[in-house]
């Protein structure tokens, strides 16, 4: 039987080659950490829709990991249920105190799963500064420097 190949504009690839280039947990978790940080600062800035967007993107990264690294699927599902869903509820309720408490529990949950997986040397730490490459506040307050808002 012929080996199944995918055709791209750059050539053909085997299914095994496609499997080999899937992101590992380190790359996925880098995205997760970034989205967790953005979620926090968007909520803190009062941009609840943006906080929900970032948390949804974090969950999308979890879905990718469940497919590409299935041995982590149960832990990712449990983390989502125990830690991310309460954050979503706080975002939905636009409740900063509930959000902050749930977010901190999520940090502890991250520590737990890193310890469980034998990588206790990995610890998420919320950056002290708001990420500067994306506006995190309410959209109606956004103003580009040197540009007058129309209307």
Question: Residue ranges of each PLM-predicted region?
Answer:
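C-terminal-biased regions
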Residues: 1-151
